[in-house]
């Protein structure tokens, strides 16, 4: 018989009798793992007392996998089997990654996905990321002395549905239970906010190795509320390295590079970038030829990239509806914020000094560990509530190729929101549901996420059916959609798990286009809505005439048909006003007919019944 042990209320639990949970910063360049130990969030070191694990793997012969620092030397000697910056490939299609510049890997198309051809076989980005997560998991279990119960894993705030799902899949493959996916700037804000205790509105500027995020948050009485987010999931330190790579190739007039030479230049360029943060120039040998770049030239090249981040920052401030003067602190996160020009230009934008005092490499992992502790139910003096937001609007296609937005961008998540729709035609027994993402008014200008069908709708007159469609976005930012026909109770649902998702360029373009074409979109939407109404009116009139033509004399019938044909002839034109007038004329010509049909229906309903029955 198993006995349950219950300790005395006054006894202190032994260390690690509670659940062991961790926070992981799965970065483009480096990854870290942290845990709350004795009430303090601390980064867990490896056996060499190193905090960071370089996000690099080498696939060797005889299935020998090397992760982290030990994999670096292979980048030069075996570049096609040494994968760096795998985070950039997460949730991407083959078409998207094939546009990446200076890519030394052998990529294989597998449906919508991309595989890396290595000596260990064809591997996906999910599998490669899983090996990095597995290494961090092993480090944590060795240090904490037990089996982990779960982890909070951070992702860029601007990661789309596919990229988030890929991250969760990688964790599952690594044997990690994902307690929550947490946006990187939010994690940084948690660590900073609890450390400083300073309430108010803060901006988190997060420029990492491969991604950029900007978040505007309000911290008040233990509640972190994200007001707005922005970013670019394909802009980071790697792009600053590319500036030096391209300058080197141009300066030395290099026409072609082997994969090994490309990896060598990449490593030297990264070192040069870091050197220029402290010195006026950097030089190295490129294919046995000397190359030198000055700090001034690098900053001239880098300004273009930094300005891109500032444009996104301004947009986030507008979305948050806050005055820049009311933002108390600008917290700099991510290794790329060590570039002096980045801090200088961000400081100029906000007209105040930025906070660089916290370790930009460790703060995200520490914040994730704090949140993991809370989700595991481990009591703390600093329990907090995180309220994150959705980066882009979600909606459905309606008649006329229009988009009906169900959840708008920058809405706090998790959230459930529902809306009722109806049928367009008499006797319609099925409905096709098309889920979209974006800010524009028309389907053709938004991104398709999924399509599914609802069958079994009872046949009835158009407009009588009631279909409730519910959108649910969880705390990880993942979407599921359900549809229920209210009368029959027939139901269908789908979890949105696309094999690849939006590139950040597409996201940024969606937002820009939503502003540039706002007026045109509204006019186009109005035209399409009027056209839909015209078609609905024509179908209703045709159906009524087919059933009750005998009620009409020749004159009334001709008047209705003339008005109907006039509308039919212009329904696909671009003249919204003319269509509206034609609809009104047709409805006016049918007033007597509608009255006659109503009277007929009433007479049929009361025929053979007495007053006491009503």
UniProtKB/Swiss-Prot annotation:
Coiled-coil regions, chain positions: none
Keywords: ATP-binding, Chaperone, Nucleotide-binding
Transmembrane segments: none
Keyword ATP-binding annotated: yes
Pfam family, one: HSP70
Single Gene Ontology BP annotation: iron-sulfur cluster assembly
GO molecular function term, any single one: ATP-dependent protein folding chaperone
Family to which this protein belongs: Belongs to the heat shock protein 70 family.
PANTHER family for the chain: HEAT SHOCK PROTEIN 70KDA (PTHR19375)
Function: Chaperone involved in the maturation of iron-sulfur cluster-containing proteins. Has a low intrinsic ATPase activity which is markedly stimulated by HscB.
Protein name: Chaperone protein HscA homolog
Species: Vesicomyosocius okutanii subsp. Calyptogena okutanii (strain HA)
Gene from which this protein is expressed: hscA
